[in-house]
């Protein structure tokens, strides 16, 4: 499994941030990781997006209105937040801090800008970049979903170019050639003791 070092490997790894371009397999890797190691706590994001059929408040997301989201931002209750497709998403700060204080490993699955905000708010966070094996494979994965219009796919690919260019801002890069192998590597990083 290819692992490449980036900004520095001496950060504590209890708060792990997983990021990478759309279509790289973040959700699939996280689902496998949680299946194997349910004690790794995955933060539940807050969103202004309406629930989709089958979604439960507090499970997939915490669903809030714009006024509540504005309050969370104003009172600095989010580690990071961003707007996507007209909806806002954010990571509640308090549950993350509670889990970390209890010594529980915490995983955040967020985008590049969210990862940057977490690094600014919590410099000890360990940032992991999930990269595709190749640009061609990323294009294949995004177009193969069959769930989005060509315009949306094009926007995602443009964003992916920006995200791939920011790879060196991360502490380590994992190349997603195999979900099981990359999950093994991610679990090893999460379990690695802090060097501080």
From Swiss-Prot:
InterPro entries: GK/Ca_channel_bsu, Guanylate_kin-like_dom, Guanylate_kinase, Guanylate_kinase_CS, P-loop_NTPase. Residues 1-24 are annotated as: Disordered. PROSITE patterns: GUANYLATE_KINASE_1 (PS00856), GUANYLATE_KINASE_2 (PS50052). SUPFAM superfamilies: P-loop containing nucleoside triphosphate hydrolases. Its main location: cytoplasm. The keyword ATP-binding applies. ATP binds at residues 20-27. It is found in: Cytoplasm. The keyword Transmembrane does not apply. It is an enzyme of class 2 (transferase). It catalyses: GMP + ATP = GDP + ADP. This is Guanylate kinase. It comes from Thermobifida fusca (strain YX). The gene is gmk.
């Amino acid at each position: 499994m290819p692992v490449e070092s980036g900004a520095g490997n001496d950060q504590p790894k209890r708060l792990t941030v997983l990021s990478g371009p759309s279509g790289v397999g973040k959700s699939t890797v996280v689902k496998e990781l949680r299946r194997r190691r349910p004690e790794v706590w995955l933060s539940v994001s807050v969103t202004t997006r309406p629930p989709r059929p089958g979604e439960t408040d507090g499970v997939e997301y915490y669903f809030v209105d714009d006024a509540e989201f504005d309050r969370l931002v104003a009172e600095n209750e989010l580690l990071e937040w961003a707007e996507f497709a007209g909806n806002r998403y954010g990571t509640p700060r308090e549950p993350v801090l509670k889990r970390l204080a209890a010594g529980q490993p915490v995983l955040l699955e967020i985008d590049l800008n969210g990862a940057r905000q977490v690094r600014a708010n919590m410099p000890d966070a360990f940032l992991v970049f999930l990269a595709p094996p190749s640009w061609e494979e990323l294009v294949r994965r995004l177009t193969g979903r069959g769930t989005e219009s060509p315009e949306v796919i094009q926007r995602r690919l443009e964003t992916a170019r920006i995200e791939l260019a920011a790879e060196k801002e991360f502490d380590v890069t994992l190349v997603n050639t195999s979900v099981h192998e990359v999950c093994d590597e991610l679990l090893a990083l999460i379990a690695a003791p802090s060097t501080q």
